[in-house]
């Protein structure tokens, strides 16, 4: 009988495959949409720029005045390039066009670089949140209340003109261009994420450890496609693949 393979151990969600999340600072998100943001703006100040383990982009701790006296509203935002401690951040319909401010995308001119864009009104930011990412406003349709934006992938998407976005590019760009240089850095990088590293290839294992293992030289020896309803210990390689082989031709992006 074969051993339990790596894919089965991942599904068990043991400590080896679980992300080390106890050091994380929190979920970065916009303020909950309220009357003040819909009709005017609210003013906050950046208290500190912090590192969040497992995330490439730095975070900014922003403090707004609370709804009641002597109470502060502390928020965690994804920091754009150029944001600094002591900077004032304005969020709302009548905020100025400055890096770090949060406005409805319908109020921003075409060609504006934005990040942390709401996909749906009130979801507090869902698109263009990774380090160095940004989206671009392509056009507005005031009749339908829709704005067309260009996503980091290059594709275009229509979102509500009332959806909010932060002006600027997410900080930390070029992070992946810096080489690791040693295995220890890769170890610590993957340790805080839910990834297993280093990953041993199946053909390098013994036949008792993996369906691709064994042989007088490293080769699979059979087709790597598997059925959707195969048992867990057999589902490796290309699972329920519609097609195999190289992708030929160019990808057409609809305007």
Curated annotation (Swiss-Prot):
Molecular function via GO: RNA binding; structural constituent of ribosome
Listed GO biological process terms: cytoplasmic translation
Source taxon at top rank: Eukaryota
Stated name of the protein: Large ribosomal subunit protein uL2
Segments for region (Disordered): 211-235
GO cellular component, one term: cytosolic large ribosomal subunit
Entry-linked SMART domains: Ribosomal_L2, Ribosomal_L2_C
Family classification: Belongs to the universal ribosomal protein uL2 family.
Record's keyword terms, sorted: Ribonucleoprotein, Ribosomal protein
Keyword Ribosomal protein: yes
Disulfide bond keyword on record: no
């Amino acid at each position: 009988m074969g051993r339990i393979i790596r894919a089965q151990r991942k599904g068990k969600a043991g400590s080896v495959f679980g992300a080390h999340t106890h050091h994380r600072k929190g979920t970065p998100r916009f303020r909950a949409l309220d009357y003040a943001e819909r009709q005017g703006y609210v003013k906050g100040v950046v208290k500190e720029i912090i590192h969040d383990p497992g995330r490439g982009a730095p975070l900014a701790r922003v403090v707004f005045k609370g709804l009641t006296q002597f109470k502060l509203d502390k928020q965690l935002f994804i920091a754009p390039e150029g944001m600094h401690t002591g900077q004032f951040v304005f969020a709302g319909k009548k905020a100025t066009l400055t890096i770090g401010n949060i406005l409805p995308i319908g109020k921003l001119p075409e060609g504006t670089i934005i990040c942390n864009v709401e996909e749906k009104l009130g979801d507090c930011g869902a698109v263009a949140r990774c380090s160095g990412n940004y989206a671009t406003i392509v056009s507005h349709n005031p009749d339908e209340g829709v704005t067309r934006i260009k996503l980091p992938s290059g594709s275009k998407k229509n979102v509500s003109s009332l959806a909010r976005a932060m002006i600027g590019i997410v900080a930390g760009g070029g992070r992946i261009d810096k080489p690791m240089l040693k295995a220890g850095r890769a170890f610590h990088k993957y340790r805080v994420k839910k990834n297993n590293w280093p990953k041993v290839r199946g053909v390098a294992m013994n036949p008792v450890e993996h369906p691709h293992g064994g042989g007088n030289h490293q080769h699979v020896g059979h087709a790597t496609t598997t059925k959707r309803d195969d048992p867990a210990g057999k589902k490796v390689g290309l699972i329920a693949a519609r097609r195999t082989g190289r992708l030929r031709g160019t990808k057409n992006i609809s305007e």
